[in-house]
Amino acid sequence: MSDKRKETAVIVSQEALSKDIYSMWLETKETAKLAVPGQFISMYTNDGSRLLPRPISLCEIDKANARLRVVYRVTGEKTGTEQFSRMKAGDKIAILGPLGNGFPLEEGAGKRVFLFGGGIGVPPMLELAKQLDTNNADKQLIMGYRDETFLTEEMKTNGTLYIATEDGSVGTKGNVMDAVRENALTADVIYACGPAPMLRAIQKYALERSIVCYISMEERMACGVGACLACVCQSKELDAHSNVHNKRVCKDGPVFLATEVEI
């Protein structure tokens, strides 16, 4: 469970990685020191026009310098993410975090692991790959994109990288599961983050082969702390908070065992 707090962070740098994809480094007081792979932060716009913050996953964690890297997609004009993209080094931004539960690193210790990332689910796989270095995991990074790729050079330095693109412009033509089949890949443990159709296919693959699988779910979030129930997903267990079969993605997740949830 996260030890969350709200603070004012300072933007260290920002750059565009591809069309609509931006990378931002933040200097924090405490948030970076507490963060683990798979968690996220809520970022607030500065003009007060939007009451709800935007949840953004953590791409890299630099505890020594108390810095966090977020990589996010601009979702349209006059959106919170569009406002973030116009900010520059030295600007201040309010954040809440770290939020949610991260990936269990110990599950991959000394094993062959798949790290699946799809679309804006690619960024959190980078810090996970870096931290899995410490437990001798054999990492196979399988990243899926619609067309334009990003973060590939960083990924290559942290494992064996396989790429799938929908248009076939880079790597395997198709999706991440097509890349697994094309390269005859196998694994003992799976970590994944991405859109629901991708996670559903990975969940099915893992269950059929009795592979331990952790998935990070992407749901629209409002409060980010589990109070509003806007981001629930269906679960196989009775939730103690709502007394129904669901889980709050922001608080109980976003990382779940694939056997825990319905996608």
Where are these regions (language model features)?
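Structural signal for conserved beta-strand scaffold positions within catalytic alpha/beta enzyme cores
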Residues: 13, 60, 163-165, 215, ...
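Short, basic/aromatic-enriched C-terminal tail that caps enzymatic domains
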Residues: 5, 246-263
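Local cysteine-cluster metal-coordination motifs and their immediate loop/turn environment
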Residues: 124, 196, 219-254
